[in-house]
Design a protein with these regions (language model features):
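Histidine-centered catalytic micro-motifs used for acid/base chemistry in nuclease
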Residues: 293-296
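Flexible loop/turn segments at secondary-structure boundaries
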Residues: 32-36, 47, 63, 282, ...
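A cross-family structural signal marking well-folded subdomains
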Residues: 20, 24, 29, 45, ...
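Extended, structured, electrostatic nucleic-acid-contact surfaces
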Residues: 283-289
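Segments forming glycine/polar-rich beta-alpha architectures that bind adenosine-containing cofactors
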Residues: 42-43, 302
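Glycine-rich phosphate-binding loops of NTPases
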Residues: 1-12
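Conserved small/polar residues in nucleotide/adenosyl-binding loops
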Residues: 304-306
Length: 306
């Protein structure tokens, strides 16, 4: 093996020394009446690095003195196998931010603990874990759109995933959950996701890509909750006030005057041009994976271009 940044391989003696001198092992023995999950939680105060997900898992299982094994096997383990540790933490934050747009990802454990403090019995705790699993399956589809069954929704999810921003995650998960509960169908979901995609693209072309984007989309998530037609509600919300959802006329003007080559992120500019190219439906599509933007022409518009 090689040490980080080292070109020479480590010797067996160096590996042995690192393990013997640098590795600490903690052994905890529990009795019949001990709560292993409570003991695990307390380890966070002894210098061991526990994630927000670790703490939340153990908080939940502390509330399951008689059903922990069944809930772990049937609900938590499938969730844990579905998502990585980082994805799990994000899921728990996405769940919290639906109700509190200001909650930070460092506050996941405390926030979820407050949210669940009124749970009365093990059946209610089990229901929470079951709900997390349902949300986890939706989040998994968001991250891996190829798993989505509906073609139109799959296409829109893939577009948002290609944009590579987490700012759309809260509202997308909310919309996905609304469909899973039967509040909206796949056509309505696809339409809402199209508005979301259009909002991202229009802001970039109009030159206002980063201005308050995260705050706006978190507020939109709260605004459309409970509304019968979340797609129309989303469009109304994004089109109101100073949210920079550029109109068609504004986009036409921006295309002629805005410095596209220097607007937003390079990856997003390339993506927009790629989507335009793909919209023509060429019988011989060009492989654009390795393409780069060298020039945006013409640099000066004349009447012939307009």
């Amino acid at each position: 093996p090689y040490a980080d940044g080292e070109e020479e391989p480590l010797t067996l003696a160096e590996v042995e020394s690192a393990v013997v001198a640098g590795l600490s092992i903690v052994s905890v023995t529990t009795g019949e009446n001990d709560n292993a999950h409570r003991i695990f939680e307390s380890l966070n105060n002894t210098g061991l690095k526990l994630t927000q997900g670790d703490l939340l898992r153990n908080y939940l299982f502390m509330q399951l003195p008689t059903r922990a094994d069944e809930v772990y096997t049937t609900l938590w383990l499938p969730l844990q196998n579905l998502l990585s540790n980082e994805e799990l933490e994000t899921l728990f934050w996405l769940d919290l931010v639906q109700q509190d747009p200001k909650v930070r990802q460092t506050e996941i454990y405390a926030g979820q603990q407050r949210r669940m403090r009124d749970l009365q019995d093990e059946s209610q705790v089990r229901a929470e874990v079951e709900r997390f699993l349902a949300l986890g399956r939706l989040y998994d589809v968001m991250l891996r759109p190829e798993k989505e069954k509906d073609a139109a929704v799959r296409f829109r999810l893939a577009r948002l995933r290609a944009w590579r921003t987490t700012t759309t995650f809260p509202i997308t998960l909310h919309l996905m959950e609304r469909r899973s509960l039967g509040d909206i169908d796949s056509d309505e979901l696809a339409r809402a996701l199209l508005y979301l995609e259009s909002y991202l693209v229009r802001r970039l072309v109009f030159g206002r890509y980063s201005d308050g984007l995260n705050t706006t989309l978190l507020a939109a998530t709260a605004d459309i909750q409970g509304q019968d037609d979340p797609a129309d509600a989303l469009q109304r919300f994004l089109s109101s006030g100073r949210k920079h959802f550029a109109s068609d006329d504004q986009i036409r003007q921006a295309v002629m005057t805005a410095p596209f080559y220097t607007t937003g992120r390079a990856a997003h500019r390339k993506l927009i041009l790629r989507w335009i190219e793909e919209s023509y439906g060429s019988k011989e599509p060009v492989d654009l994976d390795s393409a780069t933007i060298e020039h945006v022409m013409p640099q000066t518009l004349s009447l012939i271009h307009i």
